[in-house]
Amino acid sequence: MKIKILGTRGKIEPQAQDHVRHTGFLIDERILVDVGEAEYMDNRPGAVVFTHFHPDHAFFVPEKEKFTPDIPLFGPEAHELIPELQMISGKFEVEGYTFTPIPVIHALKLKSLGYIIEKDQKRLFITGDVAWIEKSNLAKIPPLDLVITEASFINKGGRINRKRDKIFGHTGVPDLIRLLSPHAKKVAFCHYGNWFFEKTPEESKEQIKALEQEVELIPAHDGMELEI
């Protein structure tokens, strides 16, 4: 399985070369997970799967453009701009790949899903943006070849907001390593926040690499290709 990380910029202004584009992952040039930039559709994917509908994962949301490519479209909940969206209620198959949804806590008003993507005995987990993953959902995760997750905040705890009994926001890179490393051989990071650009990208990537212990940590750049 070949994975191209199309963009690594979070919901911030562009500040460095190689970290300009928003979120998108191209699987074997066949399936697109998230469409943070309109140009990603130039890859002519056979299907699109959304983790959630924030604008940096769904480019058409700010301008309220209809998103109507003539291919299968999947997401965690209905959206007025995607009339043909298939709502995900459990494991499904598309283009020969098996997707297992993992509920993820991220937004206050939007539902979010990560996905375990399987083919030919290889397993990839794309988390989307993460405030937290419940223990019961972590328990559903099998051994993985690769995780791709976010790096909005380098500090432990990230930035978590609370409203009544709900949390939302982004947890920190150290927390994600602790949550995900028991399941994976490698963890790749993208969706960088402002912290990443306070130094040079090379220095910030070294900050991530310095947290490496038993699991390989991979700070990504726009267009990075990984294979499992």
Predicted feature locations:
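Conserved beta-strand hairpin/beta-sheet module of binuclear metal-dependent hydrolase folds
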Residues: 1-43, 111-128, 146
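Divalent metal-coordination and catalytic microenvironments
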Residues: 3, 25, 52, 99, ...
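Active-site metal-binding motif and surrounding structural segment of the metallo-beta-lactamase
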Residues: 30, 35-76, 143-148
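Cap/insert and terminal regions of metallo-dependent hydrolase folds
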Residues: 134-224
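Metallo-beta-lactamase
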Residues: 2-5, 70-121, 217-226
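Short amphipathic alpha-helix with an adjacent loop that forms part of the alpha/beta core around
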Residues: 39-44, 91-96, 136-142
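Active-site metal-binding loops of divalent metal-dependent hydrolases
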Residues: 8-10, 30, 35-38, 53, ...
